[in-house]
Amino acid sequence: ILGSTLGALLVVAQVLKGWMHISPGEFVIVSFFGIAFLPCPPLFDWTASAPFPFDGPAWSLFFELVANLLLASFAFLRRPRSLLIFLPIAALALTYFTLQSGTFDMGWKYETFPGGAARLAYEFFAGVLIYDFWRKGYRWHLPPAAAFALLFVVAMGSAFTQSMFRMAWDLSMQLVFIPLIVALAANATVSGSPARLCTVLGNLSYGIYMLHIPILIAMGLMTNHLFGEDQVSGLTMTLIVAVLATIAAALAHTAYDVPLRKTLTQRL
């Protein structure tokens, strides 16, 4: 909600500055879909074919809500045997859409929206299966050296720039390495300062994800206006947005998310 509100305010600011031309009716229609948290049909050019024009990352939350609804409604989706049948199908769909679109970055626009559905279907229900194994007492552990080696291999994947290697790397990340890292991390035990740090990072992570795009757009508009278009380097912009998104996420968690959750819990 907060991310979409910030995105809507940015659109209003651009209209008032004369940088965008949007009729009040168009804004109301898009706002309705944003408030209802439904994908907005690609009715207007200014939405850039985005299902959630005010806050692009909201597409994944939409699919997560759909997946949670399916999980709550159909008991068979919680059975390991059903998941072991469903996940290969989801993996095939994810592979198909990734190869078709030429990228793993799917879901944030309508051209790749079905790929986003496949992406969330595999990742979400892989998480359900991992949790089921964990709940039943299965534990996976790696020696520290092997764990660091695994993280190093994952990080080095960003060096692949050729399309063929990058595609194979993205698919291996989606289908194997990321679920493996989640399974291993779920069995890790931490205490003291590392545990507190993990808690803080966990509290901030979702806010950073949902707020970084509106902040990126705002900073892009501001720096272009002050210094000229594309005069700020990508690294500088990344650092600025990272710092601001972290601060915004901390404020949102403390002043918005926690009080709202407490109120809803008491009333519901």
Indicate residue ranges for each PLM-predicted region.
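Residue-level recognition of pore/gate-forming positions within transmembrane alpha-helices
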Residues: 4, 90-95, 128, 217
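Membrane-interface helix-loop-helix regions
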Residues: 3-65, 96-97, 172-186
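Alpha-helical transmembrane segments of multi-pass membrane proteins
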Residues: 2-3, 75
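Short hydrophobic/aromatic-enriched beta-strand-loop microsegments
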Residues: 12, 87-88, 264
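A short, conserved beta-to-alpha structural element at the edge of catalytic cores
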Residues: 24-34, 87-103, 116, 124
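Alpha-helical transmembrane segments and their helix-entry boundary regions
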Residues: 60, 83-84
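Alpha-helical transmembrane segments in multi-pass integral membrane proteins
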Residues: 42-48, 73-82, 102-255, 259-268
